[in-house]
């Protein structure tokens, strides 16, 4: 996934997660699912950054 697109997806998922937390609470099933999806996106982003840094050296 292109870095800029990934950042947009992360921001979109964060906003969605915030709305779900406010509506359903921190421990609801949907909140946990969305949080895990956000975690996955963040891990993808970190891997891309690490590859970019390693490639620059």
UniProtKB/Swiss-Prot annotation:
Pfam families on file: SpoOE-like
Q: What induces it?
A: During exponential phase and in conditions antithetical to sporulation.
GO MF terms listed in the record are: hydrolase activity; protein dimerization activity
Q: Do you know which SUPFAM superfamilies this protein is assigned to?
A: BAS1536-like
Disulfide bonding pattern of the chain: none
Gene Ontology terms: biological process? regulation of sporulation; sporulation resulting in formation of a cellular spore
The EC number(s) attached to this protein equal 3.1.3.-
Q: Which UniProt keywords apply?
A: Hydrolase, Sporulation
Q: Which residues form a coiled coil?
A: none
Protein function: Aspartyl-phosphate phosphatase which specifically dephosphorylates the sporulation transcription factor Spo0A-P and negatively regulates the sporulation initiation pathway in order to control the proper timing of sporulation.
What does the sequence similarity comment in the record state about its family? Belongs to the spo0E family.
What protein is this chain from? Aspartyl-phosphate phosphatase YnzD
Annotated organism of origin: Bacillus subtilis (strain 168)
